[in-house]
Curated annotation (Swiss-Prot):
Main location (coarse class): cytoplasm
Source organism of the structure: Rattus norvegicus
Domain FAD-binding FR-type: 304-419
Residue ranges, annotated region (E-loop): 218-273
Record-listed E.C. numbers: 1.6.3.1
Cytoplasmic side: 1-16, 84-104, 176-188, 446-578
Enzyme class (EC, first level): oxidoreductase
Name the record gives this protein: NADPH oxidase 4
GO molecular function, one term: heme binding
Length: 578
């Protein structure tokens, strides 16, 4: 199938427009700052001393200021959840844009790493030029104490140098601990190192307070390149001759452009010596707003989550899947949202996000999550919830004499799956444990489907073995029977795909016989599936939601952008559980 521009604009248009705006801001800031320090008269003397390193260091710093402010905004989860649920964002396309917050965070992080490298390299050159081009006439301009001072002293004995080295170390730890391998194998390392961001920002505010780079303040009485009245220059002294007496060693900036500007005229006579002053730090202007917003949100979340939940029951499902049912006063959530669990007995500072598989309603206050035991945190959490003698039991009711650990929740927070009920037709695709975000959607339909726009749901679940399916089969079985009894058999189209066949007839045939016709061996034929959905829903907009491996996600994403002969538009949404 050929690319559909209609579908592509729906899925990618706003995202690429925002990317273009962000990229334009970065380029504009970099170029404007570069030209300012390269051609600005107030930076003439410092530019002659440092050359290109000055321009690159300041231009990269402006890009860092922008991205260090933007990177915090996607982490304001409560604000994003409020915007998604409020009437102030009525457009579904705008709400879908909020789901790209993680992408913006990662993009800004990569940009910070790249331009930090440029910034560090430029300042290494600056340190060398400060030492080599030491000026005896403009002492206030020097960062070095004498000519040919060891540049390493500038890096490790000055506030900007020392804080810069510390920031590079902190940034290196945060970046290396953010890799997929570390997040999966040892989430603790990722969590603790990422919380070093506060140290990074404090160092950043100290870094810009050093005032090593200075600009000229008295341009009216001392035009750049002039000579003062207390000197008697030779009649034909040029600007290059004059400045060469003030700066020892090579001049990295050169004077060809300056000679052209003055048309090789004699140096002007000035009224006083140049005066230099350090810039007032501007970084705090960039980051103070987002940083205060983030800190205020964290404070609000801390207050909101300071009361522990009451654990109603713990269910140990096959395939190392745990179900946790809880209750908390005044807790409200929408289908598709997620919460963050914090168990001090497992880790004092570590938190983990889990999608709600059961939301509270007007008639019941119970809510729950499912999680797969993978990684050190979930293993320790499982051991606290289940006593050793009950590891293989199915359910531990609340009335049992069991002392559960204290558990705190933060949230709820928004996710793309909130939109699944706002389409007339939705296609939900899950891979393995990625089925959990859809559990709350199905539970909501089981309670009452009439208030929502959704009238047809295609539910596709790809599992490795039958035990992965077993813990979710009860909900699918009840939901399937509900719509058959209400004479709406086409409301939910369930398709289950398993790659292993051992024991299928024994387990499925006895308890969930009505799902036998929905069970398939192998993998879905995605292109045929999309063609069938497009044919049955001509001219409609279908919401595509995926939570699973990247291979499935990429396939669905590509098919959503493809053209079809039925006028059906597919809008792609994705949630990552990695």
């Amino acid at each position: 199938m050929a690319l559909s521009w209609r579908s592509w604009l729906a899925n990618e248009g706003v995202k690429h427009l925002c990317l273009l705006v962000w990229l334009s801001l970065n380029v504009l800031l970099f170029w404007k700052t570069f030209l300012l320090y390269n051609q600005g008269p107030e930076y003439y003397y410092i530019h002659q001393m440092l050359g290109l390193g000055l321009c690159l260091s300041r231009a990269s710093a402006s890009v860092l200021n922008l991205n260090c402010s933007l990177i915090l905004l996607p982490m304001c989860r409560t604000v994003l959840a409020y915007l998604r649920g409020s009437q102030k964002v009525p457009s579904r396309r705008t709400r879908r844009l909020l789901d790209k917050s993680k992408t913006l965070h990662i993009t800004c992080g990569i940009t910070i790493c790249i331009f930090s490298g440029v910034h560090v390299a430029a300042h290494l050159v600056n340190a060398l030029n400060f030492s080599v081009n030491y000026s005896e006439h403009f002492l206030a301009l020097n960062a070095a104490r004498y000519q040919n001072e060891d540049p390493r002293k500038l890096l490790f004995t000055t506030v900007p140098g020392l804080t810069g080295v510390c920031m590079v170390v902190v940034l290196f730890l945060m970046v290396t601990a953010s890799t997929y391998a570390i997040r999966v194998s040892n989430y603790d390392i990722f969590w603790y190192t990422h919380n070093l961001f506060f140290v990074f920002y404090m160092l950043l505010l100290l870094h810009v307070s050093g005032g090593l780079l200075k600009y000229q303040t008295n341009l009216d009485t001392h035009p750049p390149g002039c000579i003062s009245l207390n000197r008697t220059p030779s009649q034909n002294m040029s600007i290059a001759d004059y400045v060469s007496e003030h700066f020892h060693g090579s001049l990295p900036g050169g004077f060809s452009k300056l000679e052209d500007h003055y048309q090789k005229t004699l140096v002007k006579i000035c009224l006083e010596e140049p005066k230099f002053q350090a810039h007032f730090p501007q970084t705090w202007i960039w980051i103070s707003g987002p940083l205060c917003l983030y800190c205020a949100e964290r404070l609000y979340r801390c207050i909101r989550s300071n009361k522990p939940v009451t654990i109603i029951s713990v269910i140990n499902h096959p395939s190392d899947v745990m179900e946790l049912r809880m209750i908390k006063e005044n807790f409200k959530a929408r289908p598709g949202q997620y919460i963050i669990l914090h168990c001090p007995s497992v880790s004092a500072l570590e938190n983990h996000p889990f999608t709600l598989t059961m939301c509270p309603t007007e008639t019941k206050a119970t809510f729950g999550v499912h999680f797969k035991v993978v990684g050190d945190w979930t293993e320790r959490f499982r051991d606290l919830l289940l006593p050793p003698s009950s590891q293989d039991s199915e359910i531990l009711p609340f009335i049992q004499s069991r002392n559960y650990p204290k558990l705190y929740i933060d949230g709820p927070f928004g996710s793309p799956f909130e939109e699944s009920l706002n389409y007339e037709v939705s296609l939900c695709v899950a891979g393995g444990i990625g089925v959990t975000p859809f559990a709350s959607i199905l539970n909501t339909l089981l309670d009452d489907w009439k208030p929502y726009k959704l009238r047809r749901l295609y539910f596709i679940w790809v599992c490795r073995d039958i035990q992965s399916f077993q813990w979710f089969a009860d909900l699918l079985y009840v939901l399937h029977n509900k719509f058959w009894q209400e004479n709406r058999p086409d409301f939910v189209n369930i398709q289950l795909y398993l790659s292993q066949t051992d024991g299928i007839q024994k387990i499925i045939g006895e308890k969930y016989h009505t799902l036998n016709s929905r069970l398939f061996i192998g993998r879905p034929r995605w292109k045929l599936l999309f063609d069938e959905i497009a044919k049955c829903n001509r001219g409609k907009t279908v919401g595509v939601f995926c939570c699973g491996p990247s291979s499935i996600s990429k396939t669905l994403h590509n098919l959503s952008n493809r053209n079809n002969s039925y006028g059906t538009k597919f809008e792609y949404n994705k949630e990552s559980f990695s």
